[in-house]
Design a protein with these regions (language model features):
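N-terminal binding-site loop/beta-alpha segment at the start of enzyme catalytic domains
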Residues: 1-92
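Generic beta-strand or strand-like secondary-structure segments
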Residues: 75-79, 96, 114-121
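Substrate-binding cleft and catalytic face of glycoside hydrolase catalytic domains
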Residues: 96-102
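Glycine/proline-rich, positively charged
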Residues: 102-123
């Protein structure tokens, strides 16, 4: 079981994101590489735990991150559920959509149908 370091917020500087009132760490962790199904889940945990222990609270995903597409979100979800759950409210988790995800005319880019389906799948 993972327990975050108590001094984690002393190790990072945070700044407001525009006029939103939301503070973000000056460093975020993107999960494009090393979080797909080709990677070891324990290595993913080590990366995430080290980042969080050093005050990184923003994790950036996308619906097509992998490989395979979608696997980074799936793997992050597993770790969030199994190890990070009690810290969820201390995190900002962002995702985005726009690249090809499935066959047919609705599987890519920015149509309303594509974006709603991508958001549903990301949740």
């Amino acid at each position: 079981m993972y327990f975050a370091k108590e001094d984690r917020y002393e190790k990072m500087k945070y700044a407001y994101c525009g006029n939103s009132g939301l503070k973000l760490p000056l460093v975020s962790l993107g999960l494009w590489h090393n979080f797909g199904d080709h990677s070891n889940l324990e290595s993913m945990k080590d990366i995430l735990f080290t980042a969080f222990d050093n005050g990184i609270t923003h994790f950036d995903l996308a619906n097509n991150y992998g490989p395979a597409p979608g696997s980074a979100e799936k793997n992050f979800g597993i770790i969030l559920k199994e190890d990070f759950g009690k810290y969820r409210d201390e995190m900002i988790i962002s995702t985005k959509a726009g690249y090809t995800m499935w066959e047919g005319p609705y599987g890519d880019f920015g149509s309303r149908k594509y974006l709603i389906a991508s958001i549903d799948q990301s949740l």
